[in-house]
């Protein structure tokens, strides 16, 4: 009998011989390299992906309003990849735009009114011949509505029907501050006068910006970035306090800004105002998509005060009040206030919706300001902490974001984590279905008779069923009964319908093997059925097991992706099929076009194709080595 050491040496020798043959196969090495790369990505996904794949949140444990569980979105919906800013053909910067309109007039109840028709709806050959009613069917706009955001109007020109061109003065047209895209004409022009508006607009790729570097005031140096002013500056002292800040986590520092009012002499005749300013540069020609402001404060010596959040344009000198909040707190506890650009009160205070279009019309220097307003009767102390402002841009991450609500997802993180589901489902389904097929094929081929007939007829029954429609029905039924479908349910279903072809192949090989002389000799020597199967039959069919394992994985990967794409996957896990499902349900294809957001769908499709092809290449390489009819003689 061979010793354990001899068996180990023989196994190592066989593996070395197999590896020497396998490494000579270029497609086999290429395929196994891809599988190793995807396996590495799947194993180390938490370290490679910058965000969780499901409901990623920004600021958890960083702001009082968010606490230790809630968070803000990591980015705006449908953000483009951040590397778009390096593409030379993507337009960026200030652009000069020209838009044309044509006028016509109508008299209603004795009053002459002027209307305009956009250039794209005006036909110089037919429109002038239309009646007033027919022109009204084209457009009844009484003002010029520009298609792009306006940073500055350059000129407004009128070309009369007789060919005379006149540049309108500032007194002959005007804009309402809350509607910068609309121009109202003063004079009434003859019908079919061509109005040309030349204006500047900014087009840019805007990154997320965190305005305040240290919003928790971890060190005293963080106060140096702030400046302050007051209408009673001689009674105000602004300092750093290292003990009375907010501690949401054990690792948090206790720093904060302390604002002290010293009552002295004559009481103030008007409310005391203290404004803290944090200067920053906004480098983009286009406004941010959204902004969010957070301030936490508490008071000692006064229970009622007001707090304002504002932006101040250092270049134009214009101040934009975002929100004013009254704070009434009998006990000296921190109270937080947050401001979101989507709030109606912000648009109302700024005078434009969305408010960021007016606040950040182009690049420039700004200040983020927080103002305390109070009526003191004695000494008062205020403490400010978690003071910050976030500006959301339109580019984010390596692959951008989707449009999931309320927490948009980082597509690169979803792609990385999706490799886990595809590999687990593909490999486990292949292993389970292959070994079930091996077991049933061995039993059917070697035992024969009624057992063979029952197994094969059952396999035939499953083979003739339409698999994908059946998968859909079974998955839907499981979801209806349990409320959700798990990854393990999908593996079970794919395994149940994936063993039949391999079982038939094993059966045919066993039927041939059991007629061989060495099997007859083993029977004559008194070998039991299990001994013959284990020692003589299985080693002769196991080469087919390796090949089937490799070639079965792609089918399972694609089927899982198909089910997830139809919305029948595990919604609690990120998968490549789920990425396709969310893209399909987003409506982006019809509203924006496939090519504009290719980065949402194409990487997942390419990943599925590459991983499936890698297993197929490995399967072909194994077939060349293990199949005697294809094996190269060297």
Spans of model-derived segments:
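Alpha-helical transmembrane segments of integral membrane proteins
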Residues: 407-634
């Amino acid at each position: 009998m061979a010793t354990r050491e001899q068996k180990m040496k023989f196994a190592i020798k066989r593996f070395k011989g197999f590896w020497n043959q396998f490494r000579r196969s270029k497609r086999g090495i290429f395929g196994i390299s891809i599988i190793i790369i995807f396996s590495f990505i799947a194993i180390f996904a938490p370290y490679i992906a910058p965000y969780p794949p499901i409901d990623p949140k920004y600021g958890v444990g960083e702001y009082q309003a968010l606490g230790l569980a809630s968070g803000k979105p990591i980015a705006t919906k449908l953000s483009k990849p951040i590397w778009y800013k390096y593409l030379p053909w993507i337009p960026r910067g200030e652009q000069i735009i020209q838009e044309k309109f044509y006028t016509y007039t109508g008299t209603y109840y004795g009053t002459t009114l002027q209307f305009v028709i956009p250039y794209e709806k005006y036909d110089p050959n037919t429109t002038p011949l239309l009646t007033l009613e027919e022109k009204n069917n084209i457009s009844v706009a009484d003002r010029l509505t520009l298609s792009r955001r306006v940073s500055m109007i350059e000129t407004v020109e009128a070309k009369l029907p007789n060919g005379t061109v006149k540049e309108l003065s500032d007194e002959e047209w005007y804009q309402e501050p809350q509607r910068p895209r609309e121009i109202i004409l003063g004079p009434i022009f003859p019908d079919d006068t061509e109005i040309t508006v030349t204006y500047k607009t900014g087009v840019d790729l805007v990154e997320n910006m965190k305005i305040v570097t240290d919003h928790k005031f971890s060190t005293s140096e963080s106060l140096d970035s702030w400046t302050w002013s007051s209408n009673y500056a001689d009674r105000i002292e602004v300092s750093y306090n290292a003990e009375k800040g907010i501690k949401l986590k054990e690792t948090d520092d206790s720093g904060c800004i302390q604002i002290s009012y010293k009552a002295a002499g004559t009481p103030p005749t008007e409310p005391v105002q203290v404004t803290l300013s944090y200067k920053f540069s906004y480098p983009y020609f286009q406004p941010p998509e959204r902004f969010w402001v957070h301030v936490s404060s508490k008071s000692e010596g006064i229970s009622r005060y007001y707090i304002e959040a504002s932006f101040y344009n250092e270049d134009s000198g214009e101040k934009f009040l975002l929100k004013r909040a009254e704070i009434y707190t009998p006990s000296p506890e921190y109270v937080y206030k947050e401001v979101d650009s989507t709030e109606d009160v912000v648009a109302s205070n700024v005078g434009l919706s969305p408010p960021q279009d007016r606040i950040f019309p182009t690049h420039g220097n700004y200040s983020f300001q927080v103002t305390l307003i109070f009526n003191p009767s004695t000494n008062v102390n205020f403490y400010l902490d978690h003071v910050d402002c976030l500006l959301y841009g339109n580019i984010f991450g390596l692959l951008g974001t989707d449009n999931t609500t309320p927490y948009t997802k980082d597509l690169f993180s979803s792609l990385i984590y999706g490799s886990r589901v595809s590999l687990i489902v593909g490999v486990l389904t292949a292993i389970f279905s292959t070994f079930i097929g091996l077991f049933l094929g061995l039993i059917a081929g070697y035992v024969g008779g009624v057992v063979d007939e029952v197994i094969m007829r059952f396999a035939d029954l499953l083979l003739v069923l339409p698999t994908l429609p059946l998968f859909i029905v079974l998955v839907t039924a499981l979801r209806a009964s349990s409320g959700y479908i798990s990854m393990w349910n999908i593996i079970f279903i794919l395994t149940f319908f994936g063993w039949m072809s391999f079982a038939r192949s094993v059966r045919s090989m066993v039927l041939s093997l059991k007629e061989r002389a060495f099997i007859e000799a083993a029977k004559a020597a008194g070998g039991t059925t299990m001994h013959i199967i284990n020692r003589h039959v299985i080693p002769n069919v196991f080469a087919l097991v390796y090949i089937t394992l490799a070639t079965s994985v792609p089918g399972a990967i694609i089927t899982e992706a198909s089910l997830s794409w139809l919305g029948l996957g595990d919604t609690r896990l990120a998968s490549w099929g789920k990425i396709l499902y969310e893209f399909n349900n987003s409506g982006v294809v019809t509203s924006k076009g496939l090519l504009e957001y290719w980065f949402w769908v194409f990487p997942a499709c390419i990943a599925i194709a590459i991983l499936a092809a890698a297993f197929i290449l490995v399967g072909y390489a194994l077939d060349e080595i293990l199949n005697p009819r294809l094996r190269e003689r060297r």
